[in-house]
Amino acid sequence: MTRLPTRFTFLLAVCVFLSACGKTPEEQLLQATGSQALLPLHEKFLAESLNLAQSTSAFCAQRSRSSTDLAALRNRWVGAMNGWEGIQSIQFGPVIEDNQSWKVQFWPDRKNLIARKTEQFVKGDEAITLPALQEASVVIQGLSAMEYLLYDKPAEKLLSDEGQPYCDHLSTAATNLHQVADFLYQRWHPKGGNYLGTWQSPGPDNLAYPDKNAAIGALIETLVYGLERIKRDKLERPLGLSNAGQANPFLLEWWRSKQSREAILINLHSLQLLYSAGDGAGLEELLRHRDKEELSQKVTALFDRAISATASIEGSLSENHREAANRSAINTLHQTLGELLAAFKREIPATLGITLGFNANDGD
């Protein structure tokens, strides 16, 4: 029997394991980004939403609730919020169907609709049920309404006898959130709706992605959208970094729970994951394949700088954004986001021969 050389056997095993041999760099990008970034990020949101739904149900079933119980439930909410922030920037696939993102988060809330509509729903004549919630405004259906219930005036009522209607809303919203997370995950999963397969298999018979550039372009547009949203909506407008210069901390994301900085940090980590595909052959590797090692390294360094600047911000953005040290970090973050946007809007598409859609260039 002929024995294969050890080196060849090893390489063959690697090829079978990675299912990458024979694939073009673009195909490898789609495979790696899907399996190592898109699907795991949705799976994390699903898991965290389930933890929150189960914990909320247990919390509201208690005859008496303590501040310790409330603190533990808040931690579960933070976990679900973190899971959502991981996929918040994605602008293709199931999340854009039927206002799924609005069902999870209503923000920015310029008119305090979350508080007003939540109070109306809780104090209304209709029983607080899942169908009633799902037929009501998206403002009160997801994480944003839950944040109000857990961190604003209703939080005290949750610990008293009069708090049951608020707890009913809290528990129902958590169940609804889990249903949305499950819908998103199942629609992506190969054994469900398999949108992952749709994105990973561009071609003339694929109406959504007729060629590889269309599929990769959707990924780049997501990166542009996510970076632009951090820069404009999470920094410039609430902190007065735009031309007007007037800060309004109530426009910050998650200002009630003081999770604004943490949300940005998770955004950046997930966007970097979408760029690199972790250890896989992501967009970062494709640039190297196109002899753009310098550009690839520059973008990686910019992500690292943005993450470092965000992590160095002390305290909450709503209360401490004017402190000198924090202002310096915020300015560094703001500048770095601008450099990242320039790379993803112009340099990378030009290198890959990809034309981005109108929305990805909005704000130029």
For each feature predicted by the language model, list its residue ranges.
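Mature extracytoplasmic or organellar-lumen-exposed domains after removal of signal/transit peptides
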Residues: 24-364
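C-terminal motif of bacterial Sec signal peptides marking the signal peptidase cleavage site
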Residues: 18-20
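Bacterial N-terminal signal peptides that target proteins for export
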Residues: 1-10
